[in-house]
Amino acid sequence: MQVASAETYPPLPAGPFAVGCSSVEQDFARMQPGESPQLYWEGIPADDGRPRYITDLLTNPATPVVTFNVPDDGELYGKLAGKPFNVALIVCYPAAVDAGRRPYNLPNGVAVPRMQLGDQPPAFADDTRRWPLLEFAHGLAGSPLDPDYMFAMQVLASNGYIVFAPFHADARVTDVKLEDLQDVIHAVSNFGDYTAMQAVRTLALKNALDYMLASSVWNGHIDANRVAGFGASLGGESLFLQAGAKLTDSVGLSSKQVLVDNRLKSIATYVPYLGQTFFPALGRDQSGIDFMNPIPVLAIAGTADTTAPLAATQQAMERLNGTNILVSLQGVTHGFDFASADDIFTWTVVFLNATTTRDPVSLARLQRMTNVAGGGDDRVVLADVLPYPPAGDEENVVEFFNESLGHYFMTANANEIAILDAGVAIQGWTRTGEVFKAWPIGSAHGQQVCRYFGTPGVGPNTHFYSVDPNECAILSHDPQWTFEGYVLQADRAIGGTCAAGEMIIVRLYNNGIGGVANHRYTNSPTIINQMVSEGWVVEGPVFCTPP
């Protein structure tokens, strides 16, 4: 990454909270000889066709089990259409240390921490606080009680999130494996069941969220305006679908929307399965993602992952609008890479804190972070971090582009924005979609930013902005430049950086490409790298703006 302010951050310390979880008490004596509990947790039928699910082993009526009706849509749900379906849940949360709860040890070596027994209520670290809620969607052929998933849930809960995870038990619908879908013949012959399994996963997440927000046990502790998702492998795709992306529903790559859940505010994913480049999961060329709500998305992908290849993930991420970050882990294959745990959870927690709890320091860190120290080799592939909506006396600075001139222009002036949007009096300018925030002239925040335009017939046909009084003074004595006024306020970048809670705006120069000078101002590392590849020069951080 070319931005001078890019930073390597240390791994986040352990979360500040102890963790407790809801009951998953089970009677393993109910299993047949030779069976393992994983067969029930994953919903794998017996050889004679007898269904198996975790509900067959559960002994505590207080364990959440959500039952819902599948829509009567055979195209999406196949044999499940119009029938009832159920999912059990486990919920982990920030817990009181001295609640007297003990771990519940499972046969696979996992200990469920401070588990509720009988009708015990959850024992929160702060019973008066409302916590952000995090959906946790595990991958295919797994369960929340797998060691890596339980570890991940505890990390996230220890950082102040109520985390709930459905037991998807995908084998109840199909025995197709992700690896099988790399075989086109196998994909075609099993595609109907596979589509149904993907679609019902999304329904399960939506209905589980309904339950959490309505349950008298949990709803009084949840901030319903701060709901996010974490998905691993196929769980990542499930969250994309919940946010409105269309699912590939035929071998011809047609796609169909499962649902749109507007409650989901951001999505973090690890090795998200989004199909193969030749068989994308979200429609042709991943175009189904165009129908997804424009919420922030983080994707962490392995460069050696052939099951969920980085190329397919990048193809989808490049279609997103809004805050989106793609991080690659060098040499990592599919599955949880414990050597990269610090990288995975530092990126994830910083992202969730920035986009869900709206912590300005986390948002500024997210913009600057290029990798996490130690651990695996993590690298940013794509990064666009948008500011929060304006608050108080903040205002948006909107960027425009004129294709015939090859020039960029930015303004916070409402009249200028309206004129350029109308395209009548001044033609040829369109919004790029890029914005950053500033303060208006006269604000108690920031310093005045001067704007100059090249003097007609003498100077360049472009605008120049500076918060540096020395630069403004130099231009005022240069006949090539005409002063247009002070147009916004921002803090000045000192030593190439900004305060912890501010966004960094970098100035780029086109190096005279096309014969006429032009500058561009951006907080996007992706744009910076793109412009550098086109011959632009990074002049460095110039403004510090509100997050």
Q: Where are the language model's segments positioned?
A:
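Short conserved active-site loop signatures built around small residues
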Residues: 5-129, 162
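Alpha/beta-hydrolase-fold serine-hydrolase catalytic core, especially in secreted/extracellular enzymes
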Residues: 8, 331, 338-391
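Short substrate-entry loop that stabilizes the transition state in hydrolases
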Residues: 99-101, 123-176, 306-307
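Acidic beta-to-alpha connecting loop that harbors the catalytic carboxylate
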Residues: 140, 234, 303-306, 331-333
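Primarily recognizes the serine-hydrolase "nucleophile elbow" in alpha/beta-hydrolase
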Residues: 208-282
